[in-house]
Amino acid sequence: HYQEIYDSDVPVEKLYEYVIKSNKDIFLDIANHYWSVEKKGHYDMAVNISFIMFLYNEKLTAAKLISNISDDIKKDCRLSKEQMMDYNAALTYINAFLDYNDFTKMNAQFIKVADITNKPLKHIAGHFPFSFECPSVMSIYHSSPGALDYETYALEECASNYYRITNGHGKGFEALMKAEVLYNRGEIESAEILCHKALYMADGRNQYSIYIAATFIMTLISIYKGANDEFKEHMNNMTHITENTSYLPQHMHKMTDICKSYIYSNLSSPDNMCEWLKDYKQLELSINFHSLGFANIILGKYLILIGDYHKFLGISGQFLGLNHIYSYVISNIYTYIYLSIANNETGEKEKSHKFIMMAVNLAMPDRLYMPFVHNYPYINMLLDEINTAKDISLFVKNIQRLSKPYEKGVKAINKAGRLLADYGLTVREADVAKLAAKRLTNKEIADQLFIAESTVKSNMKMIFNKLEINSRAELKNFFD
């Protein structure tokens, strides 16, 4: 049984789909039988299993396997020099991940890979999503408060070498990290430019996880700007990738679910969030361990939105415990914000102040405002109440400054969405109505939407009926 498993050559991308909590004991059992099977010059599955042990955070087992496989390879006379080199390069690459998420230490191992072989890695690299189906590179690689600029620089420094040894795996991740940092600091235009750069880099190498993640940040930017056309375009692009790309792995569908549910949570639309992201047990069983911290941000916001404060307080310890394992700063900031909201809503004002201060203290050294902006309607009074100390007043002012356009943007996106939902307008009718509200003629609308003028006329009739209006002038009541 175990011999057959270790003799097989199932690639790691096929196994990755099954690396979820419910299968952990099976993979651990396979790992522990490495020493009881004959190798016969075949180590592909053993290399895969050592990487899977990292994915399960079983670092001791992973390290032991890497060491023993390396020793066995040296003694195996069936292997050619080239095969030995390929396996050793793969094991060194996996060894780098035992220092996850310190990219400076990881890069030291990646440099060793380049010393072992001058060709791209054959095993592991490029066969799993760079950010483990998490759309936020920053959330998994920001692990030290006050060190975000250094962490971003470390990713940028190692990018060219990493791309060389992996044949472009995760292409665009350094631009994406910078874009996300800038977005969270409220530097919206600069963030958008870098998102376009990340999209271009990822698209050239079919790096779908980076492409989806960049589209995700651009969707958040469109909410800030209140740009509904851009919002719809980005949401549609994410759907298009998952529905129209041949052989797209299941984890990419999960990633899109995570993106959309996060976005809908920011729009206070819990009904539009994916069901599997609303239940802690199902979530824990469905998602990669490294992405769980970010997914918990979504679940936490869902519980806040539906007012289930006691449930959130009950599971928040598990959130914090997971964040502690990898020092996930972003997930901790959100968890402390939610703890502040939940305690405030349940009458624990002192605890509420304590937790909002903990969130501020984690975010302030790196000027991370957007976690607070995303939750501003719940915490504006709390921020006023703690804003007595001079050292946080500038930080709070910047949150307040960014919250005004953001809340306006949320209202604009929700208003546009309600036109479709509440009044039954089709997407085309909404597009026509919006242009008509700007006083464009039927011909101008037809030219802009590439449709016949007669189609505009028939759409206008339907719009008037559905909105129960008699003139174009009344459209301004529905569109700003």
Which residues are covered by each model-predicted region?
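Short coil/turn connectors between adjacent alpha-helices in alpha-solenoid helical repeat scaffolds
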Residues: K14-D25, M53-K64, A96-I111, M138-Y153, ...
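Extended alpha-helical scaffolding segments used for macromolecular assembly and cargo binding
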Residues: H1-I52
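Linker/hinge segments immediately adjacent to helix-turn-helix/homeobox DNA-binding domains
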Residues: I298-L305, H310-N332, Y338-V427, K443
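Alpha-helical repeat scaffolds
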Residues: I26-Y34, T61-D72, T104-N118, L148-Y162, ...
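Recognition helix of helix-turn-helix DNA-binding domains
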Residues: A421, K438-E474
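Alpha-solenoid helical repeat architecture
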Residues: Y2-I5, G41-A46, L79-A89, P120-V137, ...
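Internal alpha-solenoid helical repeat scaffolds
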Residues: N32-A214
